Swiss-Prot record:
Entry protein name: Fimbrial assembly protein, serogroups C1 and C2
Keyword vocabulary terms for this entry: Fimbrium biogenesis
Phylogenetic lineage: Bacteria, Pseudomonadati, Pseudomonadota, Gammaproteobacteria, Cardiobacteriales
Domain of life: Bacteria
Species annotation: Dichelobacter nodosus (Bacteroides nodosus)
């Protein structure tokens, strides 16, 4: 790999890394302050899933960008490459965020002699009117 290609790829993947990190930080605010307020973070432990998803997303997207970046490619080829990388990255991140959304707590219920936390995935909206 020549120096010009390396510097170009490093610059583009660095920008991609910062954008990915910014998106992950914004979504972390949503997750940790809205979906999982303080006690639920420790009780449910789903923040590990967020860090796994974010870690993979923030590392793999810029890594793919670094591998595929080349200053000698035409603009159309670069747009296609980056569009596919962003599509793959967003698809994986949206799937992970959807699973975190389904696992978020929606109700704290006293059941017999214990307290149970119900997540979004535990509640069937079709059967709710029958309750």
């Amino acid at each position: 790999m020549n120096k010009q290609r390396f510097l170009f790829a490093a610059k583009i993947s660095g920008i991609h890394f910062l954008l990915s990190l910014t998106v992950a930080a914004l979504l972390a605010g949503l997750i940790f302050f809205v979906w999982y307020p303080f006690p639920y973070q420790k009780i449910m432990g789903n923040f590990k899933l967020f860090f796994l998803i974010s870690g993979i997303d923030v590392c793999c997207g810029p890594l793919l960008t670094f591998i595929l970046s080349n200053p000698q490619k035409r603009l159309k080829e670069c747009i296609i490459d980056f569009s596919l990388i962003i599509f793959i990255q967003l698809s994986a991140f949206i799937y992970g965020m959807y699973n975190i959304y389904l696992a978020r707590p929606v109700a704290v219920v006293f059941e017999l002699d214990s307290i149970r936390i119900l997540s979004k995935g535990d509640i069937l909206l079709d059967e709710l009117p029958q309750a």
